[in-house]
Amino acid sequence: MLGLIGKKVGMTQIFQKNGIVVPVTVIEFQPNYIIGKKTVDRDGYSALIAGSVDLKSSKVSKPIKGQYKSLKDIEPKRYVIELKGLDGYDAGDEIKVDVFKSVKYVDVTGTTKGKGFQGAMKRHNFSGGPSSHGSKFHRHLGGTGQATTPARTFKGTKMAGRMAGNQQTIQNLEVVLIDEEKRALLVKGAVPGAKGSFVVVKKSKK
């Protein structure tokens, strides 16, 4: 599966030739290198291991340094992904943004913006209680269990708690523009995460 690790720069808009305004997200790519391979004999499946963004030397352990010994001039990477079904690359090769030239749609995976501790109405879209007429609860989630049987609250019951900050994938985003010189990709619509967060862009599955 064709893919790259990139950074979400932000959103803007561009005009198409027919005058229609299209909202786009700008994704910038630092050099992506193949840092290893997985084989059927050793690992049970074949895949390429790609990495991007140099890791600080203070955060590099000896085992990680050993993994990069055979790679000349490539520093240990902060973000690492597996790419299955991608051929024609060897360890040390760079995957450039022009690999998306023939791709019309991509899937983008990122970490959503964390919202902190939120109530049930915001977190799960509950309706809440009556707003007046003597009601003693307005934004409460209501009952969380049953009666004597089962005499407990089931796991996974929707309640207040930490919201968002999860991995999310947006599928079938249209590729609007590829800028090879600036190593940038413009996709139609929004992608998960805050400005400056790192995302994984892959060729669309559908």
Swiss-Prot record:
Family membership: Belongs to the universal ribosomal protein uL3 family.
Any one GO BP annotation for this protein: translation
Chain residue ranges for the region called Disordered: 127-151
Name of the protein this chain belongs to: Large ribosomal subunit protein uL3
Self-association and partners: Part of the 50S ribosomal subunit. Forms a cluster with proteins L14 and L19.
Family matches, as PANTHER family: 50S RIBOSOMAL PROTEIN L3, LARGE RIBOSOMAL SUBUNIT PROTEIN UL3C
GO terms of molecular function: rRNA binding; structural constituent of ribosome
Entry function: One of the primary rRNA binding proteins, it binds directly near the 3'-end of the 23S rRNA, where it nucleates assembly of the 50S subunit.
UniProt keywords, alphabetically: Ribonucleoprotein, Ribosomal protein, RNA-binding, rRNA-binding
UniProt GO cellular component terms: cytosolic large ribosomal subunit
Organism, scientific name: Borreliella burgdorferi (strain ATCC 35210 / DSM 4680 / CIP 102532 / B31)
Keyword hit for Ribonucleoprotein: yes
